[in-house]
Amino acid sequence: MICITCMRPVDSLYTVYSNDHIQLTDCPYCQETVDKYVEIDNVLLFIDLLLLKAGAYRHLVFNALELHLSKYPKRKALNDCQCLRDYTQALLFNVKNWFCKYDRLNRLWLLLLSFEIYLTWVTEESKYIYYLNRNNNDGKLIMLSKKLPESFKWDSAIMRNTITSKVFTWSPPIQYLYFASYCILDVSLFHTFTQYFILKKLHWKHYSVSSKDVISYTILLSYGAKIFPILMLIWPYDTLISMSIIKWVANLYIIESLKIVTNLSYWNIIKIFISVSLLRYFMVKPILIVFVAKFNFSVIKNLIHQEFILLLQKSGTYLLL
């Protein structure tokens, strides 16, 4: 447990007296209340999370998480098992204990992923229709240069040969499976690479709660901001620009929340975020292309080539805002 103000370790958050009266503990280092959110309603806590209050994040990620995880036994070491029966029992115990321990977090991830899948599906469909109908002579389209290379000039026919075009020829259930795979892979890579860079490269760790659990919970809380674009489906706008702006705001939430929890410099957090984003961009779709092409090398090569050409064309033009 820590003080949410100075992040120093403390022995307790509050003291319970005989009449069930609770007195919050004062931090011996900064003299502030160790964790005022112990007595604050969950609605107010949620509002403070949206406002990126440092204390709200630290309360949930450090103190609340530690109290929750301490209720469950530690995992059994599989290396200590002497026979197959002991190994199987220990493995089953660890699996059951993991599902019980992280049940609430897993349900939150499932909820967020459900929204993310739907938003990704809607966004990709809107982009596909937009780019398919895009015309190089459209007055809204401004070329960055009048003498762009031929490969940079927009050709809407390219969209008909991409993986997105192939996906939208499938039935809705198969489309949903594709976008579910896309989102799960994207979130998994973001989660894995972020943990790797913070824990392994920057050697950040927390003394009491598992550092992996801390980073994982922080990502979960900040990832909730990525469902904000659902509002764009309730109050639709004419272009995709507003949705893109909201998505970038969600990215800022992730950066700020990681800064609050890890106390690393903004420069380190931004470097990690950019690196992870680039890795996701160049890994998620190629991996899915391999499966969509059914490991056919010529089809894989063609789809990746079309995606690369599409990327060049998008980089060669931009919308007049």
UniProtKB/Swiss-Prot annotation:
Membrane topology qualifier: Multi-pass membrane protein
Keyword Transmembrane: yes
Entries under InterPro entries matching the protein: Arv1 (IPR007290)
Protein origin, superkingdom: Eukaryota
Protein's UniProt keywords contain Transferase: no
Subcellular location: Endoplasmic reticulum membrane; Golgi apparatus membrane
Residues bearing carbohydrate: N296
GO biological process: endocytosis; ER to Golgi ceramide transport; GPI anchor biosynthetic process; intracellular sterol transport; regulation of plasma membrane sterol distribution; sphingolipid biosynthetic process; sphingolipid metabolic process; sterol import
Primary localization: endoplasmic reticulum
Transmembrane segments: 179-199, 214-234, 248-270, 272-292
GO CC terms in record: cortical endoplasmic reticulum; endoplasmic reticulum; endoplasmic reticulum membrane; Golgi apparatus; Golgi membrane
Keywords: Endoplasmic reticulum, Glycoprotein, Golgi apparatus, Lipid metabolism, Lipid transport, Membrane, Sphingolipid metabolism, Transmembrane, Transmembrane helix, Transport
Similarity section: Belongs to the ARV1 family.
Function: Mediator of sterol homeostasis involved in sterol uptake, trafficking and distribution into membranes. Also regulates the sphingolipid metabolism. Required for growth during anaerobiosis and sterol uptake.
Protein name: Protein ARV1
Species: Saccharomyces cerevisiae (strain ATCC 204508 / S288c)
Source lineage: Eukaryota, Fungi, Dikarya, Ascomycota, Saccharomycotina
Gene: ARV1
